């Protein structure tokens, strides 16, 4: 099967440009059709043009006026949560069955973490890629929850300030809300919480993530094995994803329960701590921007699976 589906990317910033380069270099069932922006002076649009990709600086309206629009099957949206709602409604009014891969926290469609629930959404018209922190940490919550009932999952995503563009900064609140909900909906925790830290250190540090899960008491070796397997599965599409150290365990006895702010319960059980780092592939972005690389890699993986399904049905 060497036929490919044409895709458009809305948002020629860091994420959009990195995604474009990944598709052009490594697209299996995908090929670039158009890059869409709103700033005629955009570096990303200029780069796309130099690489032979059709461009428009007139937003999604401009996309629909491009000759290639008739052949576009999948659209990646790397703008902002508010813009995605409008973009989806506008494009769907013209092409009801167009596939949208949402890299914003808008979450119109189901949350998609490829390694956890990607196969369940091959047919979805709109999928949400949660957030960079969600893509890195929710697999670990899911790894614990497939072994034990998780009462509470908390993630802390620390990213280089330099890797956080205007889109990331404009969506901080949406980041925490969307990630928290996805920890529950996809990760399987009864209650989830997400924290993001923009680290201004120079030279920039690569993405680091901490995952805490409070679960029922089970065999610690089972959880450690599940976490290791999940990390290996994520590495298939994000090679720079790795455990920073061994999984840590603490038993919290019922005689000395803890209170978790926001949950408000006296809780006991097994506390699992997972420490991760994510190094980017440096296709376009620097290696320290693992937070952006994991989003573009997850989005491409999801779209490749969608495209394979569409092509096999054709």
Curated annotation (Swiss-Prot):
Parts of the chain that traverse the membrane: none
HAMAP family assigned: Ac_ald_DH_ac
Key word Transmembrane present: no
Catalytic activity: acetaldehyde + NAD(+) + CoA = acetyl-CoA + NADH + H(+)
Record GO terms (molecular function): acetaldehyde dehydrogenase (acetylating) activity; NAD binding
Active site: 132 (acyl-thioester intermediate)
Keywords from the UniProt entry: Aromatic hydrocarbons catabolism, NAD, Oxidoreductase
Keyword NAD set for record: yes
GO biological process, one term: catabolic process
Designated name of the protein: Acetaldehyde dehydrogenase 3
SUPFAM superfamilies in alphabetical order: Glyceraldehyde-3-phosphate dehydrogenase-like, C-terminal domain, NAD(P)-binding Rossmann-fold domains
Enzyme Commission number: 1.2.1.10
Assigned protein family: Belongs to the acetaldehyde dehydrogenase family.
InterPro entries attached to this UniProt entry: Acetaldehyde_dehydrogenase, Acetylaldehyde_DH_C, NAD(P)-bd_dom_sf, Semialdehyde_DH_NAD-bd
Binding site for NAD(+): 163-171, 291
SMART domains: Semialdhyde_dh (SM00859)
Pfam families according to UniProt: AcetDehyd-dimer
